[in-house]
Amino acid sequence: MDLQGAFEAATERAKNLPNQPNDVLLDLYGIFKQATAGDVTGEKPGMFDFVGAAKYDAWEKRRGMKQDDAKQAYVDLVDQLADA
C-alpha cells in the first residue's frame, strides 16, 4: 500500500481508537493537519479560546515537517495506539 493509502486507512482506524488522553488527541490533530494542510497559517486564537489555542499549538509544533513525513508519523502513531 502506498503512503497516501496507508494514511487514509489510518484516518479511518483513528475514528475507532479507544479513548485517548487529550495530549495524544492533540498530537494526532497536529500531525493530521500538517499532513493535509502543511504549515500552520493564520493567527493563534485568543487567550480565552483554550481549545483553539491548544489545537494551534499542536499544529505549530509540526511546522517545517514535510507532508509525507507527517503522513508517515500519523500512520505510525495510529498503529501504535491501536496495538496498545
Where are these regions (language model features)?
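A charge-rich, low-complexity, intrinsically flexible signal that marks solvent-exposed coils, linkers
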Residues: 1-84
